[in-house]
């Protein structure tokens, strides 16, 4: 039983650790959602000859009329972007690298409260995962008493379940805020196409591992309690079977006195024969006292 319980505890610790790593990685990265944004092409210059609009005339001459034969989507450039809880980064079309902006500032004013609530829920989710992981490790490595281990196991399961619920709420709130920002966000930011990224997948993978760890912990707690109840039932059954061989007075006598004092003064005859069934478990009364004078007279007669 001890080996099985330890294996279940190791599985719970491993799942909780995976959930903690996934959630922390998703929280600090900016790939929850990614896609493309449609922006007007910049004018061509000496440093930029591709993905730009070339009018073919001197742009600094105000007397010249500028014509462009590009129409439709040819007039636009599709740049890549990716967004997380904290920042939204897009490709810089005027140079190399990326340009990042705060996603909280991009969200509509009516949704910023929900976004902040999502951030707080994510932080609490990670903190409760840390607490649950610490309790599981404490139960696994520092608990020699089974009863103390059960208490730690129960608290770890409660904290893990609460963290999973908070994580689920946080992920759903962020998804709602992002979808509203896509429709009502700034014109220069609104995505043309978008999809969920690997950070979003890691966040929900963390939730899955968290709930699996909580279920495993609860299962370990339940199985241990059931095993203890079964052993206690067997012990009480064996105690009742032993009690049937003794009458109540003798049973209480044996329970109250030590074995040494009983063996020196009492003989117990648990007769199993059919003819001695009525005398089973009874104490033999001590022999009747013998007169000391009769003993001396008999000894004198024998000597004569």
Swiss-Prot record:
Subcellular location: Cell membrane; Synapse
Record's GO cellular component terms: plasma membrane; synapse
Transmembrane regions listed in the UniProt entry: 9-29, 113-133, 154-174, 198-218
Top-level lineage group: Eukaryota
Polar residues bias: start-end ranges: 266-278
InterPro entries per record: GSG-1 (IPR012478), PMP-22/EMP/MP20-like (IPR050579)
One Pfam match: GSG-1
Major place of residence: membrane
Topology versus the membrane: Multi-pass membrane protein
Region (Disordered): 266-304
The entry's keywords: Cell membrane, Membrane, Synapse, Transmembrane, Transmembrane helix
Record keyword Zinc present: no
Residue numbers on the Extracellular membrane side: 30-112, 175-197
Residue ranges, Cytoplasmic side: 1-8, 134-153, 219-304
Family indicated by similarity: Belongs to the GSG1 family.
Subunit structure comment from the entry: Component of the AMPAR complex.
Protein task: As a component of the AMPAR complex, modifies AMPA receptor (AMPAR) gating.
Protein name per its UniProtKB record: Germ cell-specific gene 1-like protein
Species this chain originates from: Danio rerio (Zebrafish)
Biological classification of the source: Eukaryota, Metazoa, Chordata, Craniata, Vertebrata
């Amino acid at each position: 039983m001890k080996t099985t319980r330890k294996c279940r505890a190791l599985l719970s610790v491993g799942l909780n650790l995976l959930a903690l790593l996934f959630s922390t990685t998703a929280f600090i990265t900016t790939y929850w959602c990614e896609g493309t944004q449609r922006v007007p092409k910049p004018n061509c210059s000496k440093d930029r000859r591709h993905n730009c609009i070339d009018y073919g005339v001197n742009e600094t001459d105000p007397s010249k009329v500028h014509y462009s034969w590009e129409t439709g989507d040819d007039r636009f450039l599709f740049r890549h972007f990716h967004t997380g809880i904290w920042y939204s980064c897009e490709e810089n079309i005027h140079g190399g690298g990326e340009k990042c902006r705060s996603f909280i500032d991009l969200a509509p004013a009516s949704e910023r409260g929900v976004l902040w609530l999502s951030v707080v829920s994510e932080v609490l989710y990670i903190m409760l995962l840390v607490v649950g992981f610490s309790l599981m490790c404490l139960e696994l490595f520092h608990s020699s008493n089974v009863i103390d281990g059960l208490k730690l196991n129960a608290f770890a399961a409660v904290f893990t379940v609460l963290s999973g619920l908070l994580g689920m709420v946080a992920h759903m709130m962020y998804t709602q805020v992002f979808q509203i920002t896509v429709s009502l966000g700034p014109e220069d930011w609104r995505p043309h196409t978008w999809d969920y990224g690997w950070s979003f997948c890691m966040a929900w993978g963390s939730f899955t591992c968290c709930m699996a760890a909580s279920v495993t912990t609860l299962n370990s707690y339940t199985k241990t309690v059931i095993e203890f109840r079964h052993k206690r039932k067997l012990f009480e059954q064996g105690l009742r079977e032993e009690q049937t061989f003794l009458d109540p007075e003798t049973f209480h006598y044996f329970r109250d006195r030590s074995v040494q004092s009983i063996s020196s003064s009492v003989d117990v005859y648990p007769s199993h024969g059919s003819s001695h069934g009525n005398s089973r478990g009874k104490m033999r009364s001590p022999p009747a006292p013998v007169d000391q004078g009769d003993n001396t007279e008999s000894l004198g007669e024998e000597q004569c």
